[in-house]
Amino acid sequence: MAYSEKVIDHYENPRNVGKLDEADDSVGTGMVGAPACGDVMRLQIRVGEDGIIEDAKFKTYGCGSAIASSSLLTEWVKGKNLDEAAAIKNTEIAQELSLPPVKIHCSVLAEDAIKAAVKNYRDKKGA
């Protein structure tokens, strides 16, 4: 299976790897996993007073496609509001990275992670 140059780039040079303080009220955390393939993804967002995502971090244990999907997603969500971020579809990620059909589940994981992070943030804020 051949990976696209974008997958290889995000895998070899992942963007926004790290962790934000989960106790911070401005941080939403999404933790998702796919036991079938062993991929686990933690994605976090920091939201400003204006409701715009200021920062995003991830840590992914999994294959190159899972790492690339979460790396790309952290780039995409910065500067977006919560609704825009939660509206990102796995198909957009898969298309951007040219993921092969057997790796589509990695983009689904990334979509689930951003939705979970947005929900966690909103739950903290009581919104």
Locate each region found by the language model.
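C-terminal binding/interaction regions
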Residues: 1-22, 28-30, 48, 54, ...
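Short Gly/Pro-enriched turn/cap motifs at secondary-structure boundaries
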Residues: 31-36
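Short, thiol/selenol-centered motifs that function as redox-active sites or metal-ligating centers
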Residues: 37, 60-69, 106
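Short beta-strand elements
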Residues: 39-49
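Immediate flanking context of iron-sulfur cluster ligation sites
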Residues: 51-61
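Alpha-helical support elements that line or immediately flank enzyme active sites
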Residues: 65-80
